[in-house]
Amino acid sequence: MSMLCYTLIIAFLIGIWAAPKSEDNVPLGSPATPDLSDTSCAQTHKALKTSRNTDQRHPAPKKAEDQELGSAANIIVDPKLFQKRRFQSPRVLFSTQPPPLSRDEQSVEFLENEDALNRNIRSKRENHPVNDHGEYSVCDSVSVWVNKTTATDIKGKPVTVMVDVNLNNHVYKQYFFETKCKNPNPVPSGCRGIDSRHWNSYCTTTQSFVKALTKEGNQASWRFIRIDTACVCVISRKTGNF
């Protein structure tokens, strides 16, 4: 009887040990079911790392305003430099805003905001009313404020013109009022009002010198540069007409 009991107990234990387990094929220390939260965290970390590496290889482009301020901040102009300026020209203007189309007759002016520009325009209209008495120009010209990066100085050498001027923590732009011919031949015969039977004529742009703020290396200085300032008529007598 006791022998039968021992046999049954041994058979029962062998059956328990031999029973298959659902986790037998899972590596040691790993759960039978994957943890979705851990997988999501791993994927998120990988995405952030990839994005960070991409940002380092392709940095975000700087805004145009930041680039403009950075280039102007390279050279800070001493206000005393303007006190030493001589031979001021109404064709040179330092402004934080685009200047009006009409040229003011003052020697030099610093315009810092839109109100100053409006006052400049009103002053121009009041001081210079438009009169039309049937007068015509020999040549047609156009005048406009422009920025210049390079020019020719009074010695005939090329110079670098300062476009942005950092003065008292304000960034000003240097503008030049240029005048040039619209057309070398406003009429088929050349200049308007010239007797084409006796004269050859054509319109051409002429230049003059103005004092401008230029730079050489990291130094700013005043130099005379050449700009377009007028449109004139050039005539020559036709051969055989005396």
UniProtKB/Swiss-Prot annotation:
A biological process (GO) of this protein is: nerve development
Q: Which Pfam families does the annotation name?
A: NGF (PF00243)
Instruction: State how it assembles.
Output: Homodimer; non-covalently linked.
Family (UniProt): Belongs to the NGF-beta family.
Under the GO molecular function aspect, what terms does this record hold? growth factor activity; lipid binding; metalloendopeptidase inhibitor activity; nerve growth factor receptor binding; toxin activity
GO CC terms in record: axon; dendrite; extracellular space; synaptic vesicle
**Function comment:** Nerve growth factor is important for the development and maintenance of the sympathetic and sensory nervous systems. It stimulates division and differentiation of sympathetic and embryonic sensory neurons as well as basal forebrain cholinergic neurons in the brain. Its relevance in the snake venom is not clear. However, it has been shown to inhibit metalloproteinase-dependent proteolysis of platelet glycoprotein Ib alpha, suggesting a metalloproteinase inhibition to prevent metalloprotease autodigestion and/or protection against prey proteases.
Summary of the tissues where the protein is detected:
Expressed by the venom gland.
Which species is the source of this protein? Answer: Demansia vestigiata
Q: What is this protein called?
A: Venom nerve growth factor 2
Keywords of this protein's UniProt record, alphabetized?
Answer: Cleavage on pair of basic residues, Disulfide bond, Glycoprotein, Growth factor, Lipid-binding, Metalloenzyme inhibitor, Metalloprotease inhibitor, Protease inhibitor, Secreted, Signal, Toxin
Q: Which residues form the propeptide?
A: 19-125
Gene3D superfamilies recorded for this chain?
Answer: Cystine-knot cytokines
Transmembrane stretches, start-end: none
